[in-house]
């Protein structure tokens, strides 16, 4: 594959020029709610650009997985209908963090364009910002001035946000020739098809203040991005990105599955392009730990899947098919992205489950569509509200709705539809926009040099100094008795909550006062904050203090954390290698582990998992911790890493018996320290995600003791030895079942006897028999039995109405024989008209309906009303 060669050569080029190759971050940022998806190579370096994080390197190069399908950058609706829009793409990039600037960035880009991309220099053009004389002069070394263009802020100024780092940018374009347009220069190429942009170089040299002032940055940075798919298309000289390399390989697989040949110019061509693109977004997102859902990123992922399914229908796919395309994707991208290969089973299971669910939804949507078409008949126009509901709820694209409307010669109220679209996007924007509370803000406002050294792996107590105090969400210099606040220490043994493990609690004290630490957090890189309350005395900044972690709680938390690792490995060994951690929480009392699995665990599964963990505890293996290069870990299949997480150059490997994981948390010294492991609960938390809750040590033993006490009480109540409890309970259940059958038989006999009497009470009109009967509250418990029995006796031309009372309301059941429903007589219509005057409500079908009402007239009036209704219906 050309893309594999280009990617590899690009990264090698920059690695040979002292750039550190950095692995792609996940397609969705775990710690940045300001964006839905990773949409550029610079996303993972955002805090470095902002000066909030330090790194061991000043130059980096990446091939970043990106998704543009939500928020500010949303290409979803264009995919399949243009030559180059994609929801998933790879962005090649090189970065400088206060190292080189424009001269080297431009020099590197020119060399790569010629030696790696093999572009003819006579067809390369550049744009610069109209005020960027430096960049213009640098490009003059490589290009004639008539192929360098000055553009405005709109095209050549980049900013991360309204305030903060920003700067001029320079774009590289390639002239694809007159075949793609008659424009003589990029300025005339309105749609950008002939002069195709292939690389953007961003020069971050300013810091924009809230009033718009541009101040010079102390550290100037470079951020570049080149779309790999676009480069491949240029080199392969294809008209669109879909005719080359990976995407064409996927289209070939779709051709094979559908039995339909792809033609770029035919209407069905869009379906091939949509599926080929969307399967990449879906697969990489699931591999990185995201699942389809009803909110935020999960909702966008579900929209992508449903869009792919809808386009698949145009190719004849009327059953789940996306999972069948996944192996072809892994064949061509699995080597570059091992997380894809490791997650094949999980990806396929999630896709199939979602597709099955959506096909059922589409059946309901099809019914709704027919209702919409029927209700629109008089105006020959589908309302904007209905069109939006079909698109938003059932995933029917607006162009598909438009085609259906065209078949009926209907118009669509597009003004209302587009208004609702805008409102929905605004709601989505507000939901995903990062909200900063006051406490977040005050932490960000702290001096960047105000950091803490964590020494808590080796000790639980140390003498240190107070570096900072926060009180009432403001930076302060002291805390007085009773004050709640936060303390920052120069060095600290307190573990800050992260990676699923709760932060430490304990005390910070000196002769002047004692601060009770309730929780410890790390609001930003390098900063450890101790939250709590001053129980006595006073404390001020710069004071010498002692920091003491609660030893008992730390030990129990550490044991639980190691137990969580053993549980994770036991799940994988018991259920299969598709198991992946989807979240965890560990404190001193419990373990909570979320994992990918599509069905509930059987009692046998849970017993096997619990037994395996306890076996490893009894083996009392030492828990070893070592720091290694992340590059070494990437080549090891033994060490469990979480592909959705971001790691530094040096990582911490925790080994406990058969478990080996990357982890920054605290752990037991040996597996035997855990003592005993007990699963307390297993349940679903989302589609494809299960959760196990467990505990260890004394807490687990207490649960076992409590259950033993319960067993003793049960044995006493049912008068059985403990070892015979199950036999006795089964015997009692069988007796109960037999008694229930006897009761049911007696009730049926009672109903049958009463029905024989009721047959003589039936009246007749229009050759149709009918009955109105009031049941006592006790009889009303068998209201369906009565209706079934009498309609069995009178199977045709018969309508019955049954009334009883329950909880102060009237319960009404209407039944209509099947032959009458074919003549237009509907049970739910009868009941709705009958209850409407009294504020009642009902539901049901043509043959049977049930409702309730606080009021009803006398039975004689109901009898008369039913008689009149039948006469009207069958006249």
UniProtKB/Swiss-Prot annotation:
Its EC number is 6.1.1.7. GO terms for cellular component: cytosol. It is found in: Cytoplasm. Binds 1 zinc ion per subunit. Its main location: cytoplasm. It is an enzyme of class 6 (ligase). Catalyzes the attachment of alanine to tRNA(Ala) in a two-step reaction: alanine is first activated by ATP to form Ala-AMP and then transferred to the acceptor end of tRNA(Ala). Also edits incorrectly charged Ser-tRNA(Ala) and Gly-tRNA(Ala) via its editing domain. This is Alanine--tRNA ligase. It comes from Chlamydia trachomatis serovar D (strain ATCC VR-885 / DSM 19411 / UW-3/Cx).
